[in-house]
Each structure stands twice: as C-alpha cells, then as structure tokens.
C-alpha cells in the first residue's frame, strides 16, 4: 500500500502510470533474492534473507554512455560507494547496486566484473561503481557472506529482461530490510 492509495498526496507532482522509478524512460530494475533456512541463527548457515537489487539508468550501455548524477547526504550513517566520482564528475557510469551492509564490497566487485566480461579482449576499462547498503542484520545471517558476484549477474539479467515492471517489497536488497523496527523493503 502506498500513501497515495490512502489519499495522502506528497508534493505537487503526479506519479507515472506505474508509480515506480521505471516510469522514467529506459530505467530498469532487477533483483536477485536469497531466502533459505529457518529457525535459530547459525552464522554461515542462516537463516538467509538478503539479496541484490540493481537499477540501470537507461537502455543503452551505461558503462560507456554515462548519465548526469548528483548526491546529497541526509543521514551520514550508511555506505554508498562511488560518491566521490559523482561529486567530481557529476556522472553515473554504471548501474546502482543495493545490498546488505556487509555485502557492499562484493556487489561493487560484481558490477565491475559484469562490465569487464562484456568488453572486447584487450580493451581497457576502469570503474567506480555505486553500491549502497541496506540493513538486514536482524532477519538475515549478515555475517555469513551469502551474497556473491553471481547474484549481481542474476540481478543484471533480471533488469535487462524487465519490461519496465518493478517488483517491490521483500525482494533483492530489501528482502530482510528493517526500518525503525518495522519490516521494510525495496520500492
């Protein structure tokens, strides 16, 4: 349920047809969701409630066709890699990855690996990907290292295959998210 569904209007703008980020032409979102295990937490075994979400800002090759970007910090608690490049160049040069706090590094690396695998042999490439964190440590074995670079590839494939529809809630990087002691999610 959304605020607008309850008659609450925020701001002067109107949402697009889907009322999602994908209402912006070319924006695609994909998720890789990891859910396994039940019961008491055993580090390294679970239960696992986590994942990866990627936001691809346009239909072209975002690695070679960047988009303008900016940033603002509202809450200094949280990690988002790639911000200094955005501040310096004003450009986003790859998809945005979202995952749990302890998996930001592997998602960062997975975005680079995804780009490098698409390059012709011998091509030179550098990247400062944007990878951000969500807190899922209450519902997930956050210390178990369950997110892998393959999950980034899965989320990228899902974004490529999406027709603009965005799955929201307990998926991808929002699977185990908790916000102010309430169950949160993506979207």
Question: Where in the sequence are the language-model features?
Answer:
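Alpha/propeptide regions of enzymes that mature by internal proteolysis
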Residues: 1-186
């Amino acid at each position: 349920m959304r605020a607008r569904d309850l008659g609450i209007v925020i701001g002067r703008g109107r949402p697009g047809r889907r009322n999602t980020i994908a209402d912006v032409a070319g924006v695609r979102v994909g998720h890789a969701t990891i859910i396994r295990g039940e019961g008491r937490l055993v580090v390294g075994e679970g239960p696992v409630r986590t994942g990866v979400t990627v936001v691809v800002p346009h239909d072209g090759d975002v690695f070679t066709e960047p988009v303008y970007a900016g940033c603002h910090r509202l809450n200094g608690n949280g990690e988002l890699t790639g911000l200094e490049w955005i501040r310096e160049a004003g450009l986003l040069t790859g998809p945005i990855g979202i995952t749990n706090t302890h998996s930001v590094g592997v998602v960062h690396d997975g975005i680079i690996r995804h780009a490098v695998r698409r390059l012709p042999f011998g091509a030179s490439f550098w990247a400062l990907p944007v990878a951000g964190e969500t807190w899922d440590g209450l519902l997930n074995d956050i210390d178990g290292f369950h997110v892998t670079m393959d999950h980034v590839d899965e989320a990228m494939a899902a974004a490529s295959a999406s027709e603009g529809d965005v799955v929201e809630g307990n998926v991808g990087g929002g699977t185990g998210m908790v916000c102010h002691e309430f169950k949160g999610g993506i979207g």
